[in-house]
Amino acid sequence: MNKSKVFRKSVMIIAAFIVMTFFGLVPGGENQNSGDENSNIENFKIVKPLPEMVYFGVGEKLVFAIQYGLIYAGDATMEIRNIAMLDSVKTYHVVSLARTNRAFDLIYKVRDHHESFIDYNNLYSIRFEKHLREGGFRRDETVTFDQKNHLAVYEDKKVGIPPMTQDFLSALYYVRTVELNTGEAVYLANHSGGKNYPIYVKVLRHETVEVPAGEFDCIVIEPVLKTSSIFKHEGKLTIWLTDDNVKMPVLLRSKVVVGSFEARLKEYTLSSAEPRVPQISREARNVR
C-alpha cells in the first residue's frame, strides 16, 4: 500500500473514531491487555446498580478536541438540550455532534449528529437517532425503545431487547448516576444496529489528569463489549470521569492498530439543575 493510501486510510480511521468512539463504546475485547494488572473481566465483580442520584441536567454542555497523536482532527460536543415528552414519557434530550476540522474536510469530511432521549427517572433509552454525513456517505436511522414490551422499533422491523436497554449515549449518562468502585464492572444492556450487545464497564483506578479545561481528579473506567464483532476494527476505549458526584467525562483515549486517539475536554458548562433522586419504576428495580 502506497503512502497516500495509508494516509487516507488513517484519516478515515480518525473520522470513524470521531463518529463511533465519541461516547460510543469501542469494543475492547476481553482478551486485550489494558495495561492494568488483573484487568481481565474475570477479575472484576459484576454489579447491576440502579441510579442513585442525578447531578446532570438541562444546560450541561461538554466540548472536546479530538486528537490523533499530535494532530488535531476535529471537535465533538455533547449537550443536554431540553426536557422532551415522548408518548407521555419525560426524557432528557441529549445531542452529540462530531465534525472534522477544515484540514481533514479536504480529505474526508465528517458532520455527524446523534440524539438520545433518556427516560427522566429510569435513565434508559427511549429513542436514539443517528444522522451520518461522512464523505459521500449518508445515513439516517431512528430506533424507538419500547421498554415496557421489550422491543426496539425501527422503520422496517422490530427487535426484542433486554429490560433497561441503553443506546451508546444513554449508557454513559447511566454510568454517571451509579456508584463506581474499583474492582467492579457495571453491567449494562445495550442495543445498536438491530443487535443487542451487553456492556461491562470496568472501574480501574483513580488518578489525576490535565486537559485543556483544567486539572481533574478522576476515576478511570473501561467499557468492554461482550463480543467484539460490532466493529470491523478493534480498539480499547478508556474514559476518565471526574471523581465526584457529577462524574463528568474529561478524557477519552482509544488505542487502535495505527496509533491512539484522544478526546480532551476543552470547554464545559454544568447544569444549574438541582441534584435529584430518580424515581425508579418497580419493573426496573425488579430486573436490576
Which residues make up each language-model segment?
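Alpha-helical interaction segments
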Residues: M12-I13, A98, P163-M164, I230
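Acidic, serine/threonine-rich low-complexity disordered tracts
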Residues: L25, N33-F145, L180-R288
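Helix-centric, low-specificity signal for extended rod-like, repetitive segments
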Residues: M1-N2, L169
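Bacterial N-terminal signal peptides that target proteins for export
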Residues: K3-I14
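Bacterial N-terminal signal peptides
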Residues: I13-F22
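General helical secondary-structure elements
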Residues: S4-K5, L172, S281
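Hydrophobic, well-structured mid-protein blocks that either form specific transmembrane helices
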Residues: G135-T177
